[in-house]
Amino acid sequence: MKPFAVILLAFYALTMSAVPAKRERCTLVLADGRSVVATAMGDELVHYYLTDDGKYLQCSGDGVAHFVEPNALQKRWQTKVAKRQNFRAKKLASRQKKSQGSMTGSKRGLVILVQFPQTPFYYTNADFQRLFNEEGYTDDINFGSVHDYFLDASYGQFDFSFDVVGPITMSNPLSYYGKNNNNGDDSYPATMVAEAVQQIDPEVDFSQYDWDRDGVVEQIFVVHSGYDEAQNTRATSYIWSHAWTLTEALEEGDGEGPITVDGVVVDSYATSAELGGRTGTTTLSGIGTACHEFSHCFGLPDFYDTVGNSFGMDKWSLMDYGCYNGDGGIPVGFTSYERWFCGWLEPTELHNPLEVTDMPALTSEPIAYILRNSGKSDEYYLLENRQPESWDGEIAAHGLLVLHVDYDETAWTENTVNTVRNHQRMTIVPADNILYSFSLSGDTWPGTTGKTELSDYSTPTWGLFNENTDGQKLMNHSITEIAESEDGLISFIFDDEELGIRDVNANHNVNKAIYNLSGQRLCKPQKGINIINGKLYYEKD
């Protein structure tokens, strides 16, 4: 199915989605006074610290660190997700899928500025008007505005502007809404959102944010004063930026559920913080978190491992750690998948032998290629050209990036895309065959490795999770002669007729030396791939 076919359904299927913890090294103090250096990991659901030797820690409310077993973290995450999944199952059963098409044209979103009695805003409404709306906006860290980001991601098809209102002051201090409860969750963030909606209602016509006139506001966005717990993971009284619904929050004991104002229902929301970085800085937050959370409102799930430390998409996706590129001020551009999901790009299907030349950068033109598993069309590879320009200005490598997608509706709507280490459903095929964050510079083709071929027999290979029509987990295709020109254009050959896999019966005299892929000599071709006279052939029968 087309990936954006679940967009509007996903408006009503948001689990607690959040930005990942900023992976900063911290010195933690144990109960016995010892110090331990570890890296912040996880997200709003389950956050923890990971030492260099693979040990897990969490901090209690008083900031004291203690070791935990990874199985305990997994169980805690599964318990939280299961509770929310049960709720969503009931909700989804009562709704029908809607038509697509809301991610084009001109739309307006609502941004509410919220401050607290002891935590006033450092920046003004005018500053946020510029941050969200100004064309060509720049400041100390931001490459553009939120409006610029989505206009560029959509190739001009989605003109997303924002009405910024406030600031308004909450009735309680930040710690009331943000302090972590016994489960490690923020206590009352949805209560904060509901209070903000009710307080600003006399000034705002909420009905104008119901894009499809179904009686439900698509989303609202709350920017609160202070800092983000995702970037200050030991500050357990801060709010972790996230996207959620008031309905689901009610199930968790936070708030009273959806609010009806101006004849429409407010339910889906997202949040981010005013200030970026560590406590004590006064830098306006980068737009990366806002772009990430708004993208959840569009229906995109998280592509980082929401429970462990698998690679996912790392810095290659806004929905993973790419929201922090350039300290959050230059969030990485949408991948071809994300643009396709939103209806801004239609990848070219690869079926027959094809020579591709002058493939432009993804940031400049909506061009990508897709190769599907013949046995399961929802598993496929996407080929895109990533160059260090525009929103990709902070990427670690340039060249052809290969994405492997194994779409599953349940994993997407339940925000569990990359939680299984040996079955990541949205990731890349790194040219250097190293799927770790410390080796991003070797991810692209030909890149630093100089590799020019990707096939069933190359290293790395492009295997499958699901069987093809032949009952094997092979693509039975190849991409060869991958090259990058001096001006950043990509070329390659798909299924080279000279080098590709051929039909033995139709193309070859079998009275030659025949081998299998293990190097064993055969008397005659066997079903599958054979090496005959130094070339690859495919035996059908």
Model-derived features: where do they sit?
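Hydrophobic h-region of N-terminal signal peptides that target proteins for export
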Residues: 9-17
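C-terminal tail/sorting-segment detector
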Residues: 17, 529-541
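N-terminal prosegments of processed precursors
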Residues: 17-103, 374
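Fold-level signature of zinc-dependent metallopeptidase catalytic domains
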Residues: 88-136, 175-187, 226
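Active-site-proximal segments of metallohydrolase catalytic domains
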Residues: 96-100, 144-262
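Extracellular hydrolytic enzyme modules, especially secreted metalloproteases
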Residues: 149, 219-395, 406-408
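Extracellular low-complexity, Gly/Ser/Thr-rich intrinsically disordered linkers
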Residues: 362-497
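Residue-level detector of functionally pivotal "anchor" positions at catalytic/ligand-binding pockets or at interdomain
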Residues: 494-518
